[in-house]
Amino acid sequence: EESMKLALHYEVNSAMVYTIAAYHDLGLCEGREFHHIVSGKILFADETLWQWFTDDQMLQMKEAIEDHRASNKQAPRSIYGKIVAEADRIIDPEITLRRTVQYGLSHYPEMDKEHQYERFRKHLADKYAEGGYLKLWIPQSDNAGRLAELRQLITNEERIRRVFDQLYEEESILPKIRNL
């Protein structure tokens, strides 16, 4: 749905946009790390698609799927890659901050609260701050405004600390409640 909405701003093939959106995460069946590559292979292996799309279109869709990862260092190779990459990320400050705390607690359980906070701040700076590796490709997307809101929050040390403390408390107590 988001890909189709973003595609309205460009002269693109809507069937290609829809197909890319449908296939871009199918590779998650083999894990997250290389899912973008696996998803492209799944698309390319679908014989039915070859009946509806040209060789060039199939290659362009495969590349768009491969390029959609937020952590990619290079820009997507086509507007199709930019559309799916942008549509795939939903920047919501509250969700982003909560997931960052959750990730730290699940992957680094040995860290105390202060080290978790340092990791939290570093991740936010590396990915979301000005100059961070997260890039938005479609200026008309809803993400642009939400990223600006998140960046403003990140620069407010007092406020971000309060948010972290609250999320840390909530996320730390949940496993204890589940074990009752």
What kind of feature is each model-predicted range?
Residues 13-31, 35-39, 60-70:
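His-Asp-centered metal-binding catalytic motifs of divalent-metal-dependent phosphohydrolases/nucleases
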Residues 1-16, 38, 43-51:
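Alpha-helical phosphate/pyrophosphate-handling elements in metalloenzyme active cores
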Residues 1-12, 23, 72-180:
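Divalent metal-dependent phosphate-bond-processing catalytic cores, especially two-metal-ion Mg2+/Mn2+ enzymes
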Residues 4, 16, 58-61, 111:
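Detector for methionine-enriched segments
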Residues 37-79:
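Helix-adjacent hinge/juxtasegments
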Residues 5, 9, 29-32, 45, ...:
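Amphipathic alpha-helical interaction surfaces
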